[in-house]
Amino acid sequence: MNTQQLAKLRSIVPEMRRVRHIHFVGIGGAGMGGIAEVLANEGYQISGSDLAPNPVTQQLLNLGATIYFNHRPENVRDASVVVVSSAISADNPEIVAAHEARIPVIRRAEMLAELMRFRHGIAIAGTHGKTTTTAMVSSIYAEAGLDPTFVNGGLVKAAGVHARLGHGRYLIAEADESDASFLHLQPMVAIVTNIEADHMDTYQGDFENLKQTFINFLHNLPFYGRAVMCVDDPVIRELLPRVGRQTTTYGFSEDADVRVEDYQQIGPQGHFTLLRQDKEPMRVTLNAPGRHNALNAAAAVAVATEEGIDDEAILRALESFQGTGRRFDFLGEFPLEPVNGKSGTAMLVDDYGHHPTEVDATIKAARAGWPDKNLVMLFQPHRFTRTRDLYDDFANVLTQVDTLLMLEVYPAGEAPIPGADSRSLCRTIRGRGKIDPILVPDPAQVAEMLAPVLTGNDLILVQGAGNIGKIARSLAEIKLKPQTPEEEQHD
């Protein structure tokens, strides 16, 4: 954005001219880094802190941001405002220093709300599918020449970034319910993909509280705004009478305003028809597998149709959709070293899904697209509380694969909970008599323990939200081959 455009943007809110230096605590998170990237491109001085470098921090360094890989009081010196991730505790030395210096401290969603304030905001919320749906909406609007700004919780692979500053009037953003901070947003259009019990510590363990929070989020829409909601979801169907705004429903259900019909999956692509009110049927080829992605596409099409975007632009965007990072992310197909006289190839897929519903959707997509493959899953449970709260659901879902290897629970800062650990979960699954899970106590042993279970006609799903994505990439780098001690030392 040039100086004239920046001046025009800042002149909308004259007080924003006082803001020069914005500091982010926890800047390496995808959501935080995305907002920082948009603000850097708007011309603000950006600094931030995190514990370790990652691709997000590298992208920001490339844009001229100052990044500290520590948390120290002096990092916030001269900041006009400090933006804090929900993962950061109140006693963080930078937060304490900001309060002492009377520097405003705001949450990530509050800054996102400021970005959205004078744009046509489209917010995508829901327990599952937010990131992919955000990328689909962004891709359609970009294909239509509308040059949107987008802020996503995952890498938009076609753009190579989590966020991008556009010159159009639209801002398309993932809305995060995990800490209820999406209540700061005031979009013109809101998508809600589904509502399930997750992040229940935020909602005092009360599902009714979670449902009411989604209603409050939708009530942030102006009376002339629109809620786009998946009517297949029983909770959404229950809540529809309470929305109090114009609504468009979508789903496989016969009463959906935008209805998915005749779904068929061939390899990584979905093929289906969308039936829309007062519109010609749309025959879609979607470059993303699974019925869940057909629903995500239906939500994106509902929004784009309401905006008047041409069907041809919609179809081009969906057929060429490149997906998002760590969402059924195909990392390669590798020849296998002969093991027990077997040889062949194995496909490697990395997926972020860490809730039983998400894991189930990924397994179903793999089975539908590659029905003859031996399905091997390397799974890392995420958080002890989630493992405890959804223990039986995890045990049921994980029995659907042919072979299961399980890493220890990724704690995400939580203390261990007795009975909510990977060893207990493996024992429960084994007791159901369908598969015999393998506990992997050390991530360094993954390739070694994986090799003997491969048949030469395999699809390996690396599944979870912790540091397992790094393990997936390392498996791709070594092409699934166990390393000798000499090779590991050389690496």
Swiss-Prot record:
Pfam families: Mur_ligase (PF01225), Mur_ligase_C (PF02875), Mur_ligase_M (PF08245). It is an enzyme of class 6 (ligase). It comes from the Bacteria. One of its GO terms (molecular function) is UDP-N-acetylmuramate-L-alanine ligase activity. ATP binds at G126, T127, H128, G129, K130, T131, T132. It catalyses: UDP-N-acetyl-alpha-D-muramate + L-alanine + ATP = UDP-N-acetyl-alpha-D-muramoyl-L-alanine + ADP + phosphate + H(+). The keyword Kinase does not apply. Pathway: Cell wall biogenesis; peptidoglycan biosynthesis. Keywords: ATP-binding, Cell cycle, Cell division, Cell shape, Cell wall biogenesis/degradation, Cytoplasm, Ligase, Nucleotide-binding, Peptidoglycan synthesis. Its EC number is 6.3.2.8. GO terms for biological process: cell division; cell wall organization; peptidoglycan biosynthetic process; regulation of cell shape. It is found in: Cytoplasm. InterPro entries: Mur-like_cat_sf, Mur_ligase_C, Mur_ligase_C_dom_sf, Mur_ligase_cen, Mur_ligase_N, MurCDEF_pg_biosynth, UDP-N-AcMur_Ala_ligase_MurC. GO terms for cellular component: cytoplasm. The keyword Cell division applies. HAMAP family: MurC. NCBIfam families: murC. Cell wall formation. Belongs to the MurCDEF family. This is UDP-N-acetylmuramate--L-alanine ligase. It comes from Shigella flexneri serotype 5b (strain 8401).
